[in-house]
Every structure is written in structure tokens, then in C-alpha cells.
């Protein structure tokens, strides 16, 4: 898996001299104690799975970290002008984090809502059973799903009142949906 060039650029600006591609509780342990290929680190940052967060808590006396990340929450505003598969994938990326996540698609397009509803089971079938169960719980419960708004203003109102951690705009004209 390639590391995003923007991440590498930011790391270079911050003076990072070495990057290890690793994840999960095992990455926290490797950073806390060191391994043959990963030197012991002073600090580990960033969000992660519940196992990653638990490992950071357990090893807090061995490696520094800020407060653990909470559940993920996202609202994706989709105006229907782009591929529904993108909306489905983006919402699954957040909803698979755990049952305490929240993930909504907000749209004024009934067609997009129907397309995403049809596509989601196909993509969930490709996920691990655990991640698919998380996504299913989030997307069929009170913390997620598809909100079909009557007007764009109603969509904006819902998004602003919910005030999610992440808000994405999926539109062929994204600037039209950003307040001046």
C-alpha cells in the first residue's frame, strides 16, 4: 500500500526521518517497545480501531499519546451529480469503524438515495464479517443512514445542526455548497 504523497510531504516538513507502515494494536506495541525493524518511539498519534485505542491506553506508561480518539462520525452531502458508488464507499469507510460511529449521506436526490441503498449490500459483502456488521448496525440504526432532504437548505440545516466531526461534499460543483 502506497503512502499518500501529501502525508509524506507533511512528514518531511515536520522533520520525520522514518515512517513505518503498520496498524492496529501490534503497531502500538512495536512503537512502544521497538522491534528489529521498528525503533522504539517516544510518541504515537492518530485515530484507529478500538484495539488500537485500547493498546494506546494499556501502553500509556511506555509511549506518549494525546487523548484517545472517540467514535468516528461523518456526514456526506451528495447532490446526485456524481457516481453513487463513491457515496456508498465513503460512508462505509466511516461506518465500519465500530457500532458507536455515525455515518449519514444527506441528499436531495431520491435517485441517488435508491442507488446507494442498492449498492451498499454489494460492498458490505466484500468486507470482513466484523466490519460489515459494524456498518450494518450504524447504517440501519439511529446513528446513520440516508437522509433525503426536501431542499438543499434543509440538507444544510440537518448537517449544521448535527455538526459532525467530518463533513464531505460529493458534487460536481463543490464550491457551490460552501458558504462564502
Locations of regions flagged by a protein language model:
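Short acidic active-site motifs
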Residues: 6, 27, 151-154, 176-177
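Nonpolar helix-loop interface/hinge motif
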Residues: 155, 159-160
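Conserved NAD(P)+-binding/catalytic subdomain of aldehyde/semialdehyde dehydrogenases
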Residues: 13-104
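C-terminal core of ALDH-fold dehydrogenases
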Residues: 161-180
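Flexible, acidic loop-helix segments that line cofactor/substrate-binding pockets
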Residues: 68-75, 97-148
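Short hydrophobic alpha-helical runs that function as membrane-insertion/retention elements
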Residues: 1-2, 18-21, 104, 167-170
Amino acid at each position: 500500500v502506497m503512502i499518500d504523497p501529501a502525508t509524506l510531504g507533511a512528514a518531511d516538513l515536520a522533520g520525520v526521518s522514518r515512517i513505518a507502515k503498520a496498524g492496529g494494536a501490534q503497531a502500538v506495541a512495536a512503537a512502544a517497545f521497538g522491534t528489529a525493524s521498528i525503533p522504539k518511539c517516544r510518541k504515537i498519534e492518530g485515530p484507529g480501531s478500538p484495539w488500537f485505542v485500547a493498546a494506546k491506553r494499556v501502553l500509556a506508561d511506555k509511549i506518549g499519546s494525546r487523548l484517545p480518539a472517540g467514535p468516528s462520525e461523518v456526514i456526506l452531502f451528495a447532490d446526485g451529480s456524481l457516481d453513487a458508488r463513491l457515496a456508498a464507499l465513503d460512508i462505509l469507510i466511516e461506518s465500519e469503524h465500530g457500532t458507536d460511529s455515525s455515518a449519514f449521506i444527506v441528499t436531495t436526490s431520491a435517485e441517488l438515495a435508491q442507488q446507494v441503498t442498492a449498492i451498499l449490500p454489494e460492498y458490505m459483502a466484500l468486507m470482513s464479517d466484523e466490519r460489515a456488521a459494524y456498518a450494518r448496525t450504524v447504517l440501519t440504526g439511529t446513528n446513520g443512514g440516508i437522509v433525503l432532504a426536501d431542499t438543499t437548505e434543509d440538507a444544510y440545516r440537518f448537517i449544521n445542526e448535527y455538526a459532525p466531526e467530518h463533513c464531505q461534499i460529493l458534487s460536481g460543483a463543490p464550491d457551490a455548497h460552501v458558504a462564502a
